[in-house]
Design a protein with these regions (language model features):
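Short acidic-glycine loop/turn motifs at beta-strand connectors
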Residues: 51-54, 132-134
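Active-site- and interface-proximal helix/loop "cap" or "latch" segments in soluble metabolic
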Residues: 72, 80-89
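Short Gly/Pro-enriched turn/cap motifs at secondary-structure boundaries
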Residues: 37-39
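Short beta-strand scaffold segments in enzyme catalytic cores
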Residues: 42-51
Length: 155
């Protein structure tokens, strides 16, 4: 039997010319790119997590010479957000890459799993916004579509 998975998302070409994204958040994302520790990949990534209260938690990728020991920006931000606000829902996760010549980068598999489980914990989806520094953006209502067959343990 054949099955089909459909992914719904919005695209924004040259997002700087739209008023869709908060200037405060996009400026913060750009500023944070400078604080990423990416000496091995030279690929800075920043993330801002907006909680339902409006609180903003930030993160950047932090690479390590023992490659699996580094962390991606979105994982840093999401885990810090849930540690600081364990009973508050995440409203939006923004991820910006410093690379301006390509489409926005999608989260890696480990980050998709963490984002998905975070949504399950709070029982409601959050918006995921992927931006590159100068051009395009992708917006998803929830992360389930990015990881349709997530890993879960029996409860």
């Amino acid at each position: 039997m054949e099955h089909q998975i459909t992914l719904h998302y919005r695209t924004y070409e040259n997002w700087r010319k739209t008023s869709v994204f908060s200037e405060e958040i996009t400026e913060r994302l750009e500023s944070l790119l400078k604080t990423a520790h990416a000496p091995y990949s030279n690929y800075p990534v920043s993330s801002v997590v907006v909680m339902q209260s409006g609180a903003m938690i930030v993160g950047t990728n932090q690479e390590n010479a023992a490659f699996p020991s580094g962390l991606c920006a979105e994982r840093v931000a999401v885990l810090a957000a849930k540690a600081a606000h364990p009973h508050e829902a995440i409203q939006t996760v923004y991820i910006m890459t410093g690379e301006s010549e390509r489409e926005p980068a999608a989260p890696c598999g480990s980050c998709r799993q963490v984002l998905h489980e975070t949504e399950l914990r709070q029982t409601e989806p959050f918006e995921l916004i992927l931006l590159n520094k100068t051009h395009n953006a992708l917006a998803f209502n929830g992360v389930k579509g990015l990881l349709p067959f997530s890993f879960t343990l029996p409860r």
